[in-house]
Amino acid sequence: MRGAYSVITALLVVASSQIAAESDYQLQVYHHDVTVAGNAVVKSLPKRYLRGSQHVHDSNEERSVYSVLASMINEGVSKMPQAAEAVEKMPQAAEAVKKMPHAATAGKKVSRVTRTGKKMTSHGANARKGPLRADFVEKMPHAAEAKEEMQRANQHDLLKAIHQADEALEKSWHPSSDTAAIRYASHGISSNVILTLKEWRKNFRGMREMAVSSEHKDIIKPIHKAFVRLCGENMDPTTIEMSHIWNMMDWNVAASPATSHRQNLVSQAQRYVLIGLRSMKKDPAVWKEWNKLSKSLRFGVLDYLLNLHYQRWVRMYNIFKRHRPDKWDVPMNDKLSLDGNTDTNSALALQTHSNKQSLYPNEPSNAAWTSKGDRFVSSKRSRRTFNGNTDTASLPSKRSKVRSSKSFVPLSTESTTFGDHSVSTKTSRVSAVAPPKRPKAHNLDVLASAATALALKDSEFVMHES
C-alpha cells in the first residue's frame, strides 16, 4: 500500500509542478513520508523549473522527462471513468458468478435445441421424398400467378433497358453537319434523326435482292465514279446503291416525297441489319456467343446498327440529290471532274439526259431548235414515259454546225431577227442538257440539241446542214 501511495504522491507533485511552471512560480520543497523510489522521482523537482530556460542546467532533459510523465497522466485520466465504472460493476460481477450454475443449465438446453434441429432436418428430407400434401397442392395455382408476375416484371425490365439504351444512344450520337438536310426539308432528309425499335414494326419490305436498274447499266460507270468522289472517304457507295437512289429521284410521289423516301431508306437500313444477322448465323460459334447476350443488349446492338446503316443511306441520298451527277456532265466541284475530258462528258450528258427529265421540272423542255435552210424551226420531240413520268427523250434528226470566233451569250427577253424571220426567246436557267459553262467551238456540234435558246452576238455565222 505504501508503494502505491508513493506513486500517487509523485504524480500529484508532477501535476502541481506543471501549474506552478506555467505561472512562473518556483516550487517549494515538500517533505513527505515516502519510500526511496518516490523520493528518487521527485528529488530534482524543487531545484529547477520544469519549463527551464537555456540558463538552467539539464533543462532540456527535464522537459523530456516531463513530457513522458504528462502523456502517462493524460492516458490515466482518460481511463479513470472506465475504471470507476468497473469498480461500480464489481457487485454485479459477483452476482453473475453466483448465477453461473444457471448458465451451465442453459448450455445444456442449447445442446438439446441443436439435436432437435437435426431431427427436424431429417424429417423435412423424408417429407420431400414422400407424396405432396393436399394443402400444398391447393397452393399450386398461386405459383402459376407468381410465374405470370415474373414474366411481366421481365418485360418491364426489358422495356426499361431498351429505353435506357435509346437514351444512351441519343446522348452519344452526333450527326454530321456536312450531310444534313439542305436548307429546307423538301431538299433533303435530315440526318439528325435517331431510329428506335418501333421502326422495326413497320414499313419493312422484305429481303428482295437489289440490282442495277436496266436503264442505268450502260451509263452508270462514269456517273458512279463521280458519285464516289462526291461522297468522299469511308462511305464507298456501290453501283447498286446509287442506282437505287437514282430511281428514287424519279418516283411519282408528289404528295409527300420526303416521307416516302425516308421510309424507303429505313427499310434499306433494316435490310442491311438482317443481312448481317444472317451472315452471323452461318458461323455456329459466333451465333452461340450472340445468343448468350441478354435480350436488352441484343436489342441495343441491333438498334445501334440500324442507325448506322440509316445514317449512311441518308448521307448518300442527300449528296446525290444535292449534286445530281446524273444531270451534269461534271460535278459542281471542279476537283471532282471526270478526268477533265469535256468532250466525252458532254456526249455522256446528252445520252443520259435523253432518258431523264429536266433539272427544273417546272420548265419542260419539249422542243428543240434545229436548223433548216437559213432559219430556225421549232420542232416537237417525241415523248416517252420513264417510271410514270412524261419526259422528253428523242434527239433532233439534224445537227447544226456553227463556226464562230465569238462565244455564245444567253438572251434576255427580247426578239432576235434572223433574216426575214424573228424568233421570240425567253431567258431561262440552264437546262439539264446544257452544262453550266460556256461551250467551246470544237464541241458545238454536240451541244446543238440544248433546250436553252442561244443567240449569236455577231453576224459572222454560217449555218450548214449536216
Curated annotation (Swiss-Prot):
Question: Which protein family is it in?
Answer: Belongs to the RxLR effector family.
Lineage here is: Eukaryota, Sar, Stramenopiles, Oomycota, Peronosporales
Instruction: Provide the coiled-coil residue spans.
Output: none
The free-text domain remark for this protein reads: The RxLR-dEER motif acts to carry the protein into the host cell cytoplasm through binding to cell surface phosphatidylinositol-3-phosphate.
Superkingdom as given in the UniProt entry: Eukaryota
Q: What is this protein called?
A: Secreted RxLR effector protein 101
User: Where does the signal peptide begin and end?
Assistant: 1-21
Q: Which UniProt keywords apply?
A: Host nucleus, Secreted, Signal, Virulence
List the residue ranges of the region (Disordered): 99-127, 384-405
Summary of the function given for this chain in its UniProt record? Secreted effector that partially suppresses the host cell death induced by cell death-inducing proteins.
Biased composition of type Polar residues is found at 385-395
Q: Where is the composition biased (Basic residues)?
A: 109-121
> Where located?
Secreted; Host nucleus
Which cellular components does GO assign to this protein?
extracellular region; host cell nucleus
Q: Where is this motif: RxLR-dEER?
A: 48-63
